[in-house]
Amino acid sequence: MLKRIVGLPARRCFHRTSFLLGSDFETVHIPNTNHFKDLLIENGKFQEDQATTIVEIMTDAIRGGVNHVSQDLAKREKLTQLSYQQRVDFAKLRDQLLSADRSEFHNIQNEYESVKNDLEKLRNKLREEITKTNAGFKLDLSLEKGRIREESSHHDLQIKEIDTKIEQEVTNMKMQIDSVKTQVMQWLIGVCTGTFALVLAYMRLLT
């Protein structure tokens, strides 16, 4: 493209140009442009207007590149500042969150201790109530066992008395039955003896 603009030969050699970096496009200064133009005329066999055009084009290109680089550097500096500010803000936010977490953790810990103490009191109260209930139940059970034992002993005595009465009644009935049997036997013997005497008397009368 450069060859088409200034009508340059097919191959030319150029030397690098030193420059100073400023803060914007207007402050970029490239020294010794006339020296480079003279070198192009002497060594490159360019005409003066061609050398001037080449130097101006190269100067504009270098200034544009320097301006672009300076803008990138400025953006990078702004990004660095922004990154630093974000780190600072993040550190503040982290400190605030940590402080809030500590405060919340402290509150939760206090609530936990309060609930723990309440549960301990409730457990002790329940233990006392259970102990009292068990003691009352054991006392009632012991009294009930004693009452049942007394009633059982009383029932045993009544059963023994009834058994004794039954045995006495059975013995009396046996004695009465034996007495009746004896009387019946005596009566039968008397009847048989009388009958036998009557038969003998009747037989004597017949003879």
UniProtKB/Swiss-Prot annotation:
Belongs to the CCDC90 family. One of its GO terms (biological process) is regulation of proline metabolic process. It is found in: Mitochondrion; Membrane. One of its GO terms (cellular component) is mitochondrion. It is a single-pass membrane protein. This is Protein FMP32, mitochondrial. The lineage of its organism: Eukaryota, Fungi, Dikarya, Ascomycota, Saccharomycotina. The keyword Membrane applies. Keywords: Coiled coil, Membrane, Mitochondrion, Transit peptide, Transmembrane, Transmembrane helix. Residues 100-136 form a coiled coil. The keyword Zinc does not apply. InterPro entries: CCDC90-like. The chain crosses the membrane at residues 184-206.
